[in-house]
Amino acid sequence: MTTEEALQTIVRVVAPYVGETMARSAAQAHCQKLGVGTDIGRDQLDALISRLGSGLNIFLGREKSSRVVTELRAAMGFGSGA
């Protein structure tokens, strides 16, 4: 998957909770910290989702953040077992 495709999906899922600008800037910042290039691997994507989930805890609380992370994992094709 390209990083841009992943970012678009993240923004689509997370923006209703924190706004488009916050969703995009947080995802991009975490991509930089993880050393993500043009394409994002499954392990990097998993790490990115985990980091975003940790940040969402602050804004949404653990329960709602967990639901958003589950939704995000499903949107990225991780399925229910990931």
Annotated model-derived regions:
Residues 68-82:
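Short, charged, intrinsically disordered terminal tails
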Residues 37-72:
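Short, charged early-sequence alpha-helical segments and their helix-coil boundaries
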Residues 5, 29-32, 47, 70, ...:
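Polar/charged alpha-helical tracts
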